[in-house]
From Swiss-Prot:
Keyword Hydrolase set for record: yes
This enzyme's EC code(s): 3.6.1.-
Record keywords: Hydrolase
Name this polypeptide is given: RNA pyrophosphohydrolase
Signal sequence range: none
Originating gene: rppH
Amino acid sequence: MLDREGYRPNVGIILINERNEVFWGKRVREHSWQFPQGGIKPGESPETAMYRELYEEVGLLPQHVKIVGRTRDWLRYDVPNNWVRREWRGSYRGQKQIWYLLRLTGRDCDVNLRATRHPEFDGWRWHQYWAPVDEVIDFKRDVYLEALKELSSRFLRGMESYEDFAARQPSGNR
């Protein structure tokens, strides 16, 4: 389901632990890492889609997390044409996402990447809050930065800024 502009409605999930580190998932049979995310089905609310995707991709249930906040508006990214399925070319531009910031209230052992028959991730780790901005695939980078900035400024008081984090990184990591 695409909107009139060619964007697929989607939710993104930033899951943090008690140290404000983020869940970073390794895609099945790939060397790429990303936050959990997935499409919103027709008639489904963003929050319902978020809980469904959280279970499908991470194996966590609502009792394992607390919603800290969400982005105010949709954040969009365009997918390069060579990444778009042939049958979608011409109509599909990318994703529009509502991002949720969740705090893990359960334990690390509650994470189950094999909760469904079609896992999205085959590995995961806790990562520094800002590190995914520099590690995610290029076309998602701006949306990751925008989501992390908005959610940290509104809901995580005292969080180091991305600019301060980036200034401390070796120049080869940016």
